[in-house]
Amino acid sequence: MAVNPHAIFHYAGSPATTVLLAPSALFSEGQFTALWLVLSALSAVAIVRWLKLPIWWLLFPPTVEALYSGNPQLVVLMLLLAGAGRSGVAADTIAVTLKVYAIVPLLAERRPRRIVYALGLTLATVVVAPWLWTEYLTQFGAISARLERESAGGFSAFYHPVLLVPTAIAIILLWRRDRKAAGWLAVPALWPSSEFHYSTFAQPVMTPILAVLLSVYAQQGLVPVAIMLDVFWRFAAEPVRTRLAAWAAAASPETSGS
């Protein structure tokens, strides 16, 4: 449980996350906090470099929010972008153990080997700490309800019935056209009790529409609306450009005078 003078927030990680972070108990709270903030900052820099984004993307509001809150989000995204080979498989496995929704991009891009390893490590934590899982599953309903309350419904469409179905349809349509984009955008669009920093998952498939709208801190459905607009434009852009080019060609002086 985290407490500040203005609010109380409870730990919402799974037992897998708890087991993975257990070695942090070797450090004092201050030491681990400092180390984690440094790791998060290095992750933010790595993300920008690997995606070949301008350095000012470090000021992307969801990234800034993830940094000052010390959330594992940036570490998870960095691990998912770590690349191919054995190191990439290990990184993906750790990412999913830290945040279960990290499996969504792997599922969308059909990476069975990485999914199996990730699920294997998670299942191994059941053997290591079965009592944690028993307690977690027993209290899962209460934990989920508390998380919904403390996140004020989150930023995704999950708790907005009017937006949920059209957003899900948009992600499915996008998946048929671009699996990578659908996998990265599904989490900020649909994951329950999502936070502002979840929008950092859009960075690998960023567009101008997403860059502008996802920078705005708003919990009234802006994130799913932004993603639906982006999906619409991904489908409409080529036909619109083709039509505009045809109109421009028809209106050009050479065409008119021939």
Tell me what each language-model feature is.
Residues D92-A95, Y101-R110:
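Transmembrane-embedded, aromatic-rich helix segments that form part
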